[in-house]
């Protein structure tokens, strides 16, 4: 097959297509391994061609983070603040699970995009309209997002979270242990982790509800 001319590929490129490719590449290899050259290769173009559409790698990452924020549902206006924030947090966890590289970057950008700013404004509005003071809004937002991002980061880095993979991992760890060693770990693994239906991800909503209940009591 005759290669397409570089000019044709360049005409097909756009900022949106560059960001599409960047998101797909980061989902595949992670953001640490992400480079402009690898992105150019994935888009079948040359690195310098990308700079016709984005000024820098930082600008690409800014756009990627903004896209993740766009995937997160904002707190529904028709709900009270507590169920609205619960809905938003579950949506955030789902978006971060789709993009495991994103959690450490979500609050790192010095040039946040419109989706990022709009999301933060919507969350602050939800908490304030729910009757929380400015001080309690600050406490609530910091606590909630520390939990959401922390859980997402932990979940993304676990070697297994459920099913046969978790059973195989747990067995490989506990089987070589000397008899009688680590009794609490052994009990927890045998009677909880290795039970049918165990899913580490199910812990997310339990912890989230504890946080929201506590905030409601203090609001």
Predicted regions, residues:
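Basic, helix-initiating cap at the start of DNA-binding domains
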Residues: 1-29, 33-38, 42-45, 54-62
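N-terminal intrinsically disordered/low-complexity leader segments
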Residues: 1-13, 73, 183-192
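Alpha-helical structural segments
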Residues: 16-24, 59-75, 84-91, 118, ...
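Residues in the recognition helix of alpha-helical DNA-binding motifs
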Residues: 53-54, 140
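Hydrophobic alpha-helical connector segments
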Residues: 73-118, 134-137
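Hydrophobic alpha-helical bundle segments that form small-molecule/ligand-binding pockets
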Residues: 119-143, 147, 151-174, 197, ...
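A structured, mid-to-C-terminal "fold-capping" secondary-structure block
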Residues: 165-219
């Amino acid at each position: 097959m005759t290669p397409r001319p570089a000019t044709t590929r360049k005409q097909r490129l756009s900022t949106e297509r560059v960001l599409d490719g960047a998101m797909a590449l980061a989902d595949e290899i992670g953001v640490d391994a992400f480079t402009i050259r690898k992105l150019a290769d994935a888009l079948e173009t040359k690195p310098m061609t990308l700079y016709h559409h984005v000024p820098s790698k930082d600008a690409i990452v800014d756009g990627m983070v903004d896209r993740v924020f766009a995937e997160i549902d904002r707190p529904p206006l028709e709900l009270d603040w507590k169920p609205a924030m619960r809905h938003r947090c579950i949506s955030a966890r789902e978006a971060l699970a789709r993009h495991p590289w994103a959690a450490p970057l979500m609050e790192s950008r010095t040039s946040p995009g419109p989706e990022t700013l709009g999301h933060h404004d919507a969350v602050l509005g939800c908490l304030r309209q729910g009757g929380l003071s400015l001080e309690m809004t600050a406490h609530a937002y910091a606590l909630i997002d520390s939990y959401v991002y922390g859980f997402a980061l932990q979940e993304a880095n676990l070697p297994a979270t459920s099913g046969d993979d978790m059973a195989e991992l747990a067995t490989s760890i506990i089987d070589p242990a000397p008899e009688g060693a680590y009794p609490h770990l052994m009990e927890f693994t045998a009677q909880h982790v290795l039970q049918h239906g165990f899913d580490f991800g199910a812990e997310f909503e339990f912890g989230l509800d504890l946080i929201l209940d506590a905030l409601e009591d203090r609001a």
